[in-house]
């Protein structure tokens, strides 16, 4: 599947929640750093593996990740404060399953929702984001469309 090919090329795989079945995590390429959070559809098995939120730094870029985040300027409760207190340069969330990237000029933070690669949800097109992190910057950001939700062989 194309999603696995893209993940194989990446240094790290990030998942913004709604894994669904914990066995999905076993389909990800072995030996890759997985950074992820659980989503509102995830059960106890997923919650044992993934936290509700993450703060981390890669290549000088501070990242904050949670599943339910809202979007600029209407973030979910407490998210704006967490972005400020963590000094995150990138905020990654899921929940809507709709791909959206926007620079929040007020918070000086890049908002990223990769959409969804799965077949379940309201998203018409399955998407993921690829990008590079180096010297404190996000570069080479691109949206990968994996086909229509529900399409066989996509």
Sequence positions of predicted segments:
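Short, solvent-exposed aromatic-acidic interface loops
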Residues: 141-153
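Short, solvent-exposed coil/turn elements at secondary-structure transition points
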Residues: 40, 69-71, 117, 134, ...
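Divalent metal-coordination and catalytic microenvironments
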Residues: 13, 18, 28, 39, ...
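N-terminal active-site segment of His-dependent metallophosphoesterases
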Residues: 1-34, 42-52, 60, 124-127, ...
